[in-house]
Amino acid sequence: MIKVGILDSTLREGEQTPGVIFTVDQRVEIAKALSDLGVSMIEAGHPAVSPDIYEGIKRIVKLKKEGIITSEIVGHSRAVKRDIEIAAELEVDRIAIFYGVSDLHLKAKHKATREEALRTIAETISYAKNHGVKVRFTAEDGSRTDFDFLVTVSKTARDAGADRVSIADTVGILYPSKTKELFSALTREVPNLEFDIHAHNDLGLAVANALAAIEGGATIIHATVNGLGERVGIVPLQQIAAAIKYHFGIEVVKLDKLQYVSSLVEKYSGIPMPPNYPITGDYAFLHKAGVHVAGVLNDPRTYEFMPPETFGRTRDYTIDKYTGKHALRDKYEKLGVKISDAEMDQILAKIKSNTTIRFYRDVDLLELAEEVTGRVLKPRPPEQIEALISVKCDSNVYTTSVTRRLSVINGVKEVMEISGDYDILVKVQAKDSNELNQIIESIRATKGVRSTLTSLVLKKM
């Protein structure tokens, strides 16, 4: 039976993305979101690197002690006693000690023999265990390490007190069949030890290698939100979570929360999400070709591996020269506009003859319909109104207390503390404009609220 969980390394590996820096507050917010998502472990950073990382981990550990965060908190460390001491004084749940074990790393980086490396690994793991924490050893460049020596390294780590060993594909050169073979052999040769995979994505094979590692016996997959990390990053959390659900039937995180976490990290990292990114990109459940749209309208399974609602998304399709009658008719029906077959043919002909328009918006379709029919058309009002309310708090109030008050107002669906000109973002839903106004007034009347800004949601992808 397959057993697998996710270690999220957005706060450690993810911050090693060129140009990415998280503030202390952002680190804490991301950690809370990851815990709510349900990841097994959060690699909160390498505290010896800088004071802000140290402070971020300190606050994250405090939230863990208070029960607000439930994931296991991991502190990163070199195989250096001072690093271990710094991580241990923060009272993290686990210290992850890394050391390059390939002959290349031993010679070029550590200037050490294999025997010296084994001694360092054993001594530092034992030292960390003496501080009363769980220990993971990371075999850096493990994928390019002689197998027999990798087995010796793993046994040395286990015997010194590590309960996990992470095999790092540091330069992303593994391929799936080799990965499965490697982990199958390691789990066979080194009993009483669990293995992680830390797969870099240099050849675009990180997700495939992670799945293969699971088949080989790995029980923890290292991932980052949006695939952040050194160079081109590591396993993207949203992709591996979806793949594990599809292929193994295991829900390692709350899939419907992936979109929120992805957007949060996109905002704080400053790395934009490509529209064609799997699962959380704008185009992930957006269909274009007429044949595809017709199939989806008849049975979404024809062109969707899982329903978008699983991931908190909705499906849609574009209208352009590739569009067929099924899509166009469905679009007008959703707009509440009646169009005859003959009129539909004329509208479709106009759309196909104009090759310069990439997307026809709803307003464009209404204008085309009015041009063809000669009628003034009014679209059907939306079944419900969604809005985002930006809230600015008084300077002398605790933002979290205002957040709690807002969360119990009828019609409020989600409340988020944010950075920038406003302090809180509130997602609301109302059946009509009157109800929306009542919700807004309730928000404005909440103690600690200074001002609000309302933005209506026009369309969701």
UniProtKB/Swiss-Prot annotation:
Pathway this chain belongs to: Amino-acid biosynthesis; L-lysine biosynthesis via AAA pathway; L-alpha-aminoadipate from 2-oxoglutarate: step 1/5
Known cofactor(s): Mg(2+); Mn(2+)
InterPro entries given in the database record: 2-IPM_HCS-like (IPR050073), AIPM/Hcit_synth_CS (IPR002034), Aldolase_TIM (IPR013785), Dimeric_a/b-barrel (IPR011008), Homocitrate_synth (IPR011872), LeuA/HCS_post-cat (IPR054691), PYR_CT (IPR000891), Tscrpt_reg_AsnC/Lrp_C (IPR019887)
SS bonds (residue pairs): none
Domain of life where this protein originates: Archaea
PANTHER family in UniProt: HOMOCITRATE SYNTHASE (PTHR10277:SF63), HOMOCITRATE SYNTHASE-RELATED (PTHR10277)
Family: Belongs to the alpha-IPM synthase/homocitrate synthase family. Homocitrate synthase LYS20/LYS21 subfamily.
NCBIfam families per UniProt: LysS_fung_arch (TIGR02146), PRK00915.1-2 (NF002085)
Protein name: Homocitrate synthase
